[in-house]
Amino acid sequence: MNYFELFKFSPAFDIDTAVLAERYRELQRAVHPDKFAHDTEQQKLLSVQRTAQVNDGYQTLKDPIRRAEHLLSLRGIDLSHETTTVKDTVFLMQQMEWREALEDIRHSTDPQESIDELYQSFAEYRAKLTYMLTAQLNSSKDEDALLAADQVRKLKFMAKLHDELTRIEDALLD
């Protein structure tokens, strides 16, 4: 299913999330199972299925990584069950530095400063990746779609690192 069509957007990485939320509410009202309470079982089932599609579509388009994956899937690149790893050596070296920095937080004299610095580093790198991803997804070239897939892999890794940093910060605050 093309969620961009469902929500009446052109397939693009940059979408107006306020408009997305508004269209989500409109679609929810139109397909909500309560509207079909007195209809046939088949119509009730169809309503439940449409509601699930609308919910999944909203969650997909709302999340930048899932939105990028959806755009790539529309171009024939499926990352949903992928096990391919990033082969970019510069990124792998940066990844190792971040992992070391995460380990060093526990032994830091000012762990909150270290945490803040890592959050800032992650945000800057994610912004750079997102900028490149946007350009690659807006391109119609197949090689740019493959490069975009690599950016998505990196962003997924960055999301995991961010979650790990948040867990470390929460543990230090407890």
Curated annotation (Swiss-Prot):
GO terms for cellular component: iron-sulfur cluster transfer complex. Residues 2-74 form the J domain. It comes from the Bacteria. One of its GO terms (molecular function) is protein-folding chaperone binding. It holds the Pfam family HSCB_C. InterPro entries: DnaJ_domain (IPR001623), HscB (IPR004640), HscB_C_sf (IPR036386), HscB_oligo_C (IPR009073), J_dom_sf (IPR036869). Gene3D superfamilies: DnaJ domain, HscB, C-terminal domain. PROSITE patterns: DNAJ_2. Coiled coil: none annotated. Transmembrane segments: none annotated. One of its GO terms (biological process) is [2Fe-2S] cluster assembly. Keywords: Chaperone. Co-chaperone involved in the maturation of iron-sulfur cluster-containing proteins. Seems to help targeting proteins to be folded toward HscA. PANTHER family: IRON-SULFUR CLUSTER CO-CHAPERONE PROTEIN HSCB. Belongs to the HscB family. Interacts with HscA and stimulates its ATPase activity. This is Co-chaperone protein HscB homolog. It comes from Shewanella sp. (strain W3-18-1). The gene is hscB.
